[in-house]
Amino acid sequence: TSLCASKQRYLVINLQLGLFLTVKEPSGYSEATLESFNSGTNQLFCLIPEGNRYFIAFDNDDYDTVLDVEFAQDVAGARVIAYTKKASNDDNQLWGLVPLPETPGIIATALPSSNVITGTGIGESMEMQPEDPDLNQVFGFLKY
């Protein structure tokens, strides 16, 4: 059973092109969400709230090789996040997103941790390398 099945909030990401789609969020469920960018074919992510931590569960049978990682990364001029893998199975990789105290609102994730791809703006921070799962994949998120 997918971790997303029992959740009410979803983040759709285009893994092939690295483009962000609209967040699917039922009305009346407006606590902390992740905002998306652009458009394209989709992959479904679910946002799982736990206090001040946010979890993204990968729901993709073909993408189950995300590495364990825990680090803080500077993206778009701000130290924004430390995150840790919490659990996994054949279908899901669960990560906790931990905003740092000085975070000005931007969260970015990098998968896996080697050769982190960064840039001076949110566009660069969303860059990814879909053709090679062993290369780092960086997604930019907006937290509010």
From Swiss-Prot:
Subunit (UniProt): Homodimer.
Function of the protein: Possesses D-galactose binding specificity.
Keyword Transmembrane found: no
Coiled coil feature spans: none
Cysteines engaged in disulfide bonds, as pairs: 4-46
Single GO term (MF): carbohydrate binding
Disulfide bond among keywords: yes
Keywords, comma-separated and alphabetical: Disulfide bond, Lectin
Protein name: Lectin-1
Tissues expressed in: Stored in spherulous cells in the sponge tissue.
